[in-house]
Regions:
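Peripheral, non-AAA+ core regions of ATP-driven protein-machinery
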Residues: 2-12, 16-83, 88-94, 101-112, ...
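P-loop (Walker A) phosphate-binding loop of NTP-binding proteins
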Residues: 98, 124
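Conserved RecA-like ASCE P-loop NTPase motor core of nucleic-acid helicases/translocases
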Residues: 119-123
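Conserved Rossmann-like nucleotide-cofactor binding loop
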Residues: 127
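Conserved SAM-binding strand-loop segment of SAM-dependent methyltransferases
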Residues: 147-148
Length: 455
């Protein structure tokens, strides 16, 4: 008979404690412990469900054979880009995102578009008829895609073993449970053990498994933090529900570059890949407008240009307002302090509002120069000269530092027809400078206005 044990788990990080604690000693969060009843079976859940596996033996690195098909084309160029060129056989991939952002749509498109591959789509949230309706709306046909509405882990593993698919999609990990644990689906212990079982099965059979995870109100993936540690890839699906564009961002990738992004457009027929993000992030105005600047950014290995909008106005109240959309407010406050200290602009009595086009969330320090350029333009109510963009990081002393992969940013600006780009003067002399674009170098932020307003 199984030995029943009660334990308390932190909902934030999965830390286990024998009694309730007000504050988690692992992550430091308050009031996150919940009680769960766990039935301890002989052996781990993963070993019981997935079955016994042959013991591995140490091998020399040179003796290990690489798979002939090291990457699986999932049938979507943007997803392939974020994964580093395709899905690696035997990998466990976690996709997180807000409700309604399009996680299920993207995962179903991947399962249907993987031509030549046998796929199994496991849904714990929808019936087979509902999935069929969504598949018809997407307009993608794949006779090799199997639909399986199920939540019991043991049944799922049995079907995977019977059909031997190349790709399995689990929607979602919070709805899957095992009978070997007494806790409910979505609990810390259930998520941890189900993920560990799927990981063991993926590594032993070479089946790629794509699991969807819900997120909490603070934007992190629900469940124990160990879930993100054990998977090979963590993808974050971002976007504004009021905007048609979505970003797939690689947070963790054992087989490729991290923070690589893929851009999608949400249509009635599903998600469409956007191969050139710069085209949707830039707007061509009939007349020059103040408060608008263009920054050359680079996420992962992909450069793109994005429009930055700023509005600087007199503070109506004693304390000025500072508001941002898609940007870190603390970093904007730092840049405003640099402008006041190093350039002499009286920002302490100004309201400042900042927005990035397309509802994008950016954290690239190489966009500091573009943010400051938009603020300066709005402050003096003077439009930035036509065909000018910026790429550089600003330090607390007002110095302009080179942005990572500046050469790629310059090349992207030249490809899109920009006439001038403002970068750091500390960029090496050996840096490549493409033809057709003037590279203006500055060493400090007080030199920026002259570079922006010169026609």
């Amino acid at each position: 008979m199984a030995k029943v044990k009660k334990a308390f788990f932190c909902k934030n990080c999965g830390f286990e404690a024998p009694k309730w604690l007000g504050r988690c000693p692992s992550c430091g969060e308050w009031n996150t412990f919940t009680e769960e009843i766990i039935a301890r079976e002989s052996g781990s859940v993963a070993a019981t469900v997935a079955g016994p596996q042959p013991a591995a033996k140490p091998q020399r690195v040179g003796d290990i054979r690489e798979s002939e098909h090291r990457r699986i084309d999932v049938g979507n160029s943007e997803v392939n880009r974020v994964l580093g060129g395709g899905m690696v056989p035997g990998s466990l991939i976690l996709l997180g995102g807000e409700p309604g952002i399009g996680k299920s749509t993207l995962s179903l498109q991947i399962a249907l578009a993987a031509n030549g591959l046998k796929t199994l789509y496991v849904s714990g949230e929808e019936s087979a008829e509902q999935i069929k309706m969504r598949a018809a709306r997407l307009g993608i046909g794949n006779d090799e895609c199997l639909i399986y509405p199920e939540t019991l882990l043991e049944n799922i593993v049995n079907q995977i073993g019977e059909h031997r698919p190349d790709l399995v999609v689990i929607d979602s990990i919070q709805t899957i449970y095992t009978d070997l644990l007494d806790s409910s689906a979505g609990s810390v212990s259930q998520i941890r053990e189900c993920a560990a079982t799927l990981l063991k099965y993926a590594k032993s059979t070479g089946t790629s498994i794509f699991i969807i995870g819900h997120i909490t109100k603070d934007g992190s993936i629900a469940g124990p933090k160990i879930l993100e540690h054990i998977v090979d890839v963590v993808l974050q699906f971002e976007g504004d529900s009021n905007n048609i564009y979505r970003i797939l961002r690689g947070i963790k990738n054992r087989f490729g570059a991290t923070f690589e992004i893929g851009v999608f457009e949400m249509l009635d027929s599903g998600l469409r890949s956007v191969d050139n993000p710069s085209e949707i992030l830039l707007t061509h105005y009939e007349e020059p407008l103040s408060g608008i600047a263009v920054g050359a950014s680079a996420d992962g290995v992909r450069p793109y240009l994005i429009e930055v909008q700023a509005l600087v106005s007199g503070a109506a109240y004693g304390t000025p307002q500072r508001s941002t959309t898609g940007y870190d407010t603390k970093r904007m406050n730092m840049l405003l302090a640099v402008l006041e200290k190093r350039v002499g602009m009286k920002m302490f009595q100004k309201d400042v509002f900042l927005n990035f086009a397309g509802g994008f969330k950016v954290a690239d320090p190489g966009l500091d120069l573009a943010v400051v350029a938009a603020v300066i333009s709005s402050y003096y109510d003077r439009p930035v000269a036509e065909g000018v963009c910026c790429a550089g990081e600003i330090g607390l002393s007002g110095e302009v530092r080179p942005a990572p992969r500046t050469e790629q940013r310059i090349s992207e600006a030249a490809r899109l027809g920009f006439k001038r780009i403002v970068v750091s003067g500390y960029l090496g002399k050996g840096a490549k400078r493409p033809k057709g674009i003037e590279v203006v170098t500055i060493n400090s932020v007080d030199q920026l206005p002259r570079a922006l307003f010169v026609e």
